[in-house]
């Protein structure tokens, strides 16, 4: 079932999954630049706002045990609240609204996809959910990796595909069958920085051994629209509903340093927006997550407003 032209916005003010504060301010920054009024002015018929958390879930310095994560309890509580909120959003209307989730952090994604899978499974016939993971990082660090520093956000994809060593408490975010929400049949890595030291050879070995589709940042920079079209074609016959995840560290910080941690991907802001426009133009896309925006890097919120304006234009153009 295609999403309607109405938009449900879910705000997730959290930065408890990393070691740099600031991302918890991003949802309010999107509100401060007028995202709701911009959507109304652009002709989006209905906009609904939802707050997944009663208060921001903020970073605090803490230790962690081997095989675990820093601030594990609060991170899992955030995921539980997000899954509950998105599930309620789906139950509120017959034809689901387009889900726009504004973080916050990438590590809320297992909860989002779990809610999407549960909604998809309730359809007749049951539907399949796909993910386009726009991120410079593979985020495949297992909690049991000897080099792990306990950063929950860096374990994001490890929990999505349920790598060995993934936190047992994250298994609740799954398909209704109990399987992981992501595998090579329904997931595309888009804009991956192949030269980033944090993307280790063993991460790429896992992806290629499992036949994941990986679209490098260099190839996105070269031809954004074509890479986006190829990504949609890859998923076309494999899934019925697509979630797009935009981690803004996929955008090169040379001229757009909005991300929490800079990542020199070579993909300029306008090029990433060209790719995103193609992706959001697909009728199968039912949601967009925006993560890793740090307003502390954006005095005056000019970059946040620029990003917001592009997203609004894309959502307003949806049929």
How should each PLM-predicted stretch be described?
Residues 2-319:
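Conserved alpha-helical scaffold segments that buttress catalytic/binding sites
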